[in-house]
A protein has these predicted regions:
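Short Gly/aromatic-enriched secondary-structure transition segments
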Residues: 29-43
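Short, mixed-charge aromatic SLiMs
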Residues: 424
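Structural signature of tandem-repeat unit edges
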Residues: 15-26, 45-58, 67-80, 90-103, ...
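The feature captures the LRR N-terminal capping module
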Residues: 1-19
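Consensus positions within tandem repeat domains that build extended binding/scaffold surfaces
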Residues: 60-63, 82-85, 105-108, 128-131, ...
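Conserved, function-critical positions that sit in or immediately flank catalytic
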Residues: 427
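Intrinsically disordered, low-complexity segments enriched in polar/charged residues with Gly/Pro
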Residues: 1, 189-191, 379
Length: 438
């Protein structure tokens, strides 16, 4: 048998389609600086099984990444599985976890698309970020009785997983680890938990002031309870809800809260007389909040909003009407990219229009730019093939060269700013009018 590297306490060989590992201690690898990756000696070898001998205490990072493993028994001596250890083992169907395993690193079993059932060992305390992300065949997951931490995106896209139970030992759930679990009906929490709770299968913090996760299989109308003051990151991500009612108690909605809710048609934000709907934290509509909501048709934004963050309405292909309040100063990258809006009037206080802000809005026919706008960034209107005319106000001092690239329907551009050289800004054949030179 050969050592994993010179001086290592673990050696290896392959016989009859099986990788044999023998030794003691942690499995570590040297870094191949020339190839800029870990030097895993069996990386290019073919095997479908692994046999452990001795007292190996960890499985190293990327140890079996993209291998053809079909099943594996992790010995009781192993206490930790490092990041990416079994990532993209697309033939892996069965894993038996050892009794003394304590933690599983990020992306460890990501994209193991044939893995169907997981029963964690009795000592597992940490399931890290994206650990089982993309395990689309996973139908059953039994947690460890001592599990205390579930990382962000730990089960993202586990589209066959129907339910999951969290014991009272769980003290940390990062973001919404169950986003994109399109078949999930229930997240169950032990009634003895001091940190989390569940009602009708929905995950909340213990006092139910923070909505953490609406199961992806939730359909139809959903009313956020009056106890909720915050809707967390990815809370509805990928769910099948058609409508959501948000009470006046809610003061904050976080990043990607409704991302990829493809059946979502309406979001109603209630308000008290003294308040004007949700006061988005820092007056910011968070990034990707409605990204991919392809059935959403109309949006009314709160009057005190100042920033529309990245990708907020990206891919909202049914969205036809948006009124942007006068208070908005920034529209960031990809904010409305690929949406179905037909016309847009930029608010009077807008100073910044980010890259790709309205890129690929193929139905966009009319744009009114505000006096006060300073920059039109890269690809801001690229691919807006229905746009026929554009009037650039005097305040604009910079337009990126590809801002109007692919605007095949553009016939006329009025350029009021003396700071801009029309050059190659507009597509060939566009009539460019500079009023001062008339």
């Amino acid at each position: 048998m050969e050592p994993v590297f010179e001086g290592a306490d673990i050696s290896w060989e392959i016989r009859d389609d099986t990788l044999y590992l023998r030794g003691k201690g942690d499995m570590t690898f040297l870094r191949d600086e020339e190839k800029d990756r870990l030097d895993i000696p069996w990386y290019y070898e073919d095997f479908t099984r692994v046999s452990f001998e001795g007292n190996i205490t960890s499985i190293g990072p990327e140890a079996f990444h993209t291998s053809d493993l079909v099943e594996i028994d992790i010995p009781d001596s192993v206490e930790h599985i490092d990041a990416l250890a079994f990532c993209s083992c697309r033939s892996l169907e069965k894993v038996r976890f050892g009794r003394h395993l304590r933690s599983i690193g990020g992306y460890a079993f990501e994209d193991c698309v044939k893995l169907r059932r997981v029963v964690l060992g009795g000592c597992v305390e940490v399931v890290d970020y994206s650990c089982f992300e993309g395990c689309s065949s996973l139908i059953s997951f039994e947690t460890s009785p001592v599990l205390r931490s579930v990382g962000e995106r730990a089960f993202f896209g586990c589209s066959s997983l129907v339910r999951i139970s969290l014991t009272e030992k769980v003290l940390r759930v990062a973001g919404n680890p169950f986003a994109g679990c399109s078949s999930m009906k229930e997240i169950e929490v032990s009634p003895f938990s001091s940190v989390y709770s569940s009602a009708d299968g929905v995950l909340y913090n213990r006092p139910r002031s923070v909505l953490i996760s609406v199961p992806g299989g939730t359909e139809g109308a959903f009313t956020v309870p009056d106890s909720v003051v915050e809707i967390g990151r990815d809370a509805f991500h990928g769910s099948r809800v058609a409508s959501v009612v948000i009470p006046a108690t809610v003061r904050s909605i976080d990043v990607a809260a409704f991302k990829d809710c493809r059946e979502l048609r309406s979001v109603t934000i209630a308000h008290e007389e003294a308040r004007h709907g949700v006061r988005f934290r820092d007056r910011i509509l968070k990034g990707e909040m409605f990204c991919g909501c392809s059935s959403l048709e109309e949006v009314v934004l709160p009057e005190d909003l100042e920033t529309v963050e990245f990708g907020a309405f990206e891919g909202c292909s049914s969205l036809r009407t948006v009124r942007i309040p006068a208070s908005v100063e920034r529209i960031n990258e990809r904010a409305f990219k690929g949406s179905g809006i037909k016309e847009i009037e930029l608010p009077e206080n807008l100073e910044y229009l980010g890259p790709m802000a309205f890129e690929s809005c193929a139905s966009l026919e009319s744009v009114k730019l505000n006096e006060g706008l300073v920059t039109i960034d890269s690809a801001a209107f690229r691919g807006c093939s229905s746009l026929g005319e554009i009037d650039i106000p005097e305040s604009v001092v910079e337009i990126e060269a590809d801002a109007f690239e692919g605007c095949t329907g553009l016939r006329k551009a009025i350029l009021r700013s003396s700071a801009i050289d029309p050059g190659d800004i507009f597509p060939e054949g566009v009539e460019t009018i500079v009023p001062d030179s008339e």
